[in-house]
Amino acid sequence: MKRILSFFLTLVLTAALLCPAALAVNETAAKDRDWVYITLDPGHGGDGAGGNDSGAVNEKYGYQEADLVLKIGLYLKEELETYRNVHVDMTRSDSYGTRYTPLREVKQRVDFAAEQCSDLLVSLHLNSAGSNQSVHGGLILASNGNYDPDCAKVIDAVGTNILAQLSRLGIDTSRGLVKEGSHDGTTYPNGKLADYYGIVRYGQLRHIPAMIVEHCFVSSNSDCEQFLSSDAKLRAIAQADARGIAAYYGLEKKDPGEVDVEPLFRDCRSHWAKDYVNTLYFTGVLTGSAAPRTRAGSTVWEAACSSRTARSRAPCS
């Protein structure tokens, strides 16, 4: 089927190339594969319908996890966008939240990342040990890799980089990467033990590297004083996260005034039919929406580059 479709597209492409507009394809084709799409998920917060989950709360200072991780998320988005070829989406960008952030449900957060064709989902949190003041420091909740080991490897690598950067701020990261299996025997479709944490588990099922960054303990007065007590300190945490992510993907800072040009259709930027699809779009043979995905309104597109089919069946690359 792929060979037949490729032959058909080649015929259409040959005709389309006679149009000068097709030359624009060459300007973006080489860059498309270099783009990184990241979804940030500030944990807890509003559900988009008036409900709210504050997350963990520090009894002495009154700091609420949901508020602090939102600030970290906004700072992190800002910092990541100083790098070339990075697009950042957020499950929520305010305290009210969205339909993707319902209370006590996390699947929708992963669904959102999948809809954005994300290469990485980073869920931002602060830990809590209740009244135990001796517990402090950061860790990352990663995957056991029982369903999609390739995605798990990405989590391990990005997570290790982030922890190294948080450690430079003075945060105790000795707990490292934590991989916790299901407590009740829940398994993945392949019969292997599933991950315990929903963000990580649903990420595995959607073939998206998804991790939870517990930056430090909001229940710890010491951690609050050292790392959470000002916007400058929250920004420093966000910048540490960004450096860790950038190190894994090999990101480079933009030059002053530099403007990125995103791929036409983010869901097929690494697909074998990408160049065909871009050319057909430029020449008017194929119509669609450039952000974030094409609209499957043409037989060519549905056959060549259907994101929902490709993303649901293909592991991380």
Enumerate the predicted regions with their spans.
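Short glycine-rich His-centered loop
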Residues: W35-G62
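Residue-level detector of conserved, well-ordered beta-strand and adjacent loop positions
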Residues: T14, D41, L141, E214, ...
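Short, solvent-exposed loop/turn elements at domain surfaces
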Residues: D47-N52, N221-S222, T287-S289
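Sec-dependent N-terminal signal peptides of Gram-positive bacterial secreted proteins and lipoproteins
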Residues: R3-A24
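Extracytoplasmic Gram-positive cell-surface binding/anchoring modules and repeats
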Residues: V259-C316
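Active-site-proximal helix/loop segments of hydrolytic enzymes
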Residues: A24-I38, K60-Y63, D67-V259
